[in-house]
């Protein structure tokens, strides 16, 4: 890619720093769109997804996914799924998004749910 946008440059910086700090821990990857928010725990060594949650899940689907309350709900659901999978320590991958608003709400709820990062 000859011309990277500011977002793409930031995403590369974040991912490079995560690889250096991961130390074998799974990555909590977050993606935010205008309507929804998605989060998943990824084991990069094995290349598998350990747990996932989003505002498109059946239990949450009727509500809007573009609020901090919905993001917090996704964080709680992901933390519960991570506990079920036996994961407590993760590396938070904000993926180029600023740590503010819905991203911060999801992270705080995941921490309250028992994930450490």
Swiss-Prot record:
Single GO cellular component annotation? cytosolic large ribosomal subunit
Tell me the protein's name.
Large ribosomal subunit protein uL18
Q: Give the highest taxon in the source lineage.
A: Bacteria
Name the UniProt key words of this record, in alphabetical order.
Answer: Ribonucleoprotein, Ribosomal protein, RNA-binding, rRNA-binding
The record ties this protein, via SUPFAM superfamilies, to:
Translational machinery components
Similarity comment: Belongs to the universal ribosomal protein uL18 family.
Show which residues constitute the signal peptide.
none
Task: Name the GO terms of the biological process aspect.
Answer: translation
Say yes or no: keyword Secreted present. Answer: no
The UniProt subunit note reads as follows: Part of the 50S ribosomal subunit; part of the 5S rRNA/L5/L18/L25 subcomplex. Contacts the 5S and 23S rRNAs.
UniProt function note: This is one of the proteins that bind and probably mediate the attachment of the 5S RNA into the large ribosomal subunit, where it forms part of the central protuberance.
Under the GO molecular function aspect, what terms does this record hold?
Answer: 5S rRNA binding; structural constituent of ribosome
- The gene behind this protein is rplR
